[in-house]
């Protein structure tokens, strides 16, 4: 129960209704928390891999700002920037990529993170609304920052060495370590793009691989 006395305005940014007992080592899960009941249900399925965060939510709709951006999902909860996502509701990032990698490790699942390839949802934007396939063009600074560096930084976060002489690798590896996991995660696969097709996708994908 929350009781407020006096006059004024109160802004509530984040509310969690998780049970008092949560999944996992509290030192490992210092920020985002997982419900033991949901984790048990997942464990009982004996999954061999886990694709996250899903599909169309990665791509964004209308504007690139509502693409799922993994960098906003790590670090302390209070610093995780929420967005209005593709599905039309606020994405809290209460569970982000760090918690995802930890859960895969706990349940012996191979992680399969999905990152955007610089294309807005082709079904919604291109087919349903007839606005064409809107994308970030390869060869631009925006493409490097939003697509290429986005993939590289995730690899640094998951597998990077905290003592690396490469500044970006060391930075993201230390973000991981400060969250409770100094050792690298086991990551072998990355999905770039979701249910995309056509020249626009193949050009963006190829540019990301160069």
Regions found by a protein language model. Give the residues of each.
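Non-catalytic accessory regions flanking glycosidase/transglycosidase catalytic cores in CAZymes
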Residues: 1-210
């Amino acid at each position: 129960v929350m009781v407020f006395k006096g006059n004024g305005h109160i802004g509530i940014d984040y509310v969690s209704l998780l049970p008092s007992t949560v999944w996992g080592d509290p030192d490992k899960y210092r920020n985002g928390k997982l419900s033991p009941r949901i984790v048990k249900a997942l464990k009982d399925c004996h999954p061999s891999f886990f694709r996250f965060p899903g599909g169309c939510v990665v791509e964004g709709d209308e504007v690139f700002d509502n693409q799922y951006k993994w960098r906003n999902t790590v670090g302390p909860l209070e610093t995780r920037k929420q967005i209005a996502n593709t599905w039309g509701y606020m994405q809290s990032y209460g569970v982000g990529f760090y918690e995802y990698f930890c859960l895969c490790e706990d349940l012996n699942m191979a992680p399969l993170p999905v990152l955007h390839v610089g294309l807005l949802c082709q079904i919604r934007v291109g087919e349903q609304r007839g606005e064409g396939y809107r994308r970030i063009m390869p060869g631009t600074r925006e493409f490097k920052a939003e697509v290429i560096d986005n993939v590289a930084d995730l690899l640094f976060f998951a597998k990077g060495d905290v003592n690396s002489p490469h500044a970006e690798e060391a930075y993201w590896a230390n973000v991981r370590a400060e969250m409770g996991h100094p050792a690298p995660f086991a990551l072998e696969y990355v999905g770039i793009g979701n249910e995309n097709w056509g020249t626009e996708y193949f050009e963006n994908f190829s540019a990301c691989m160069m």
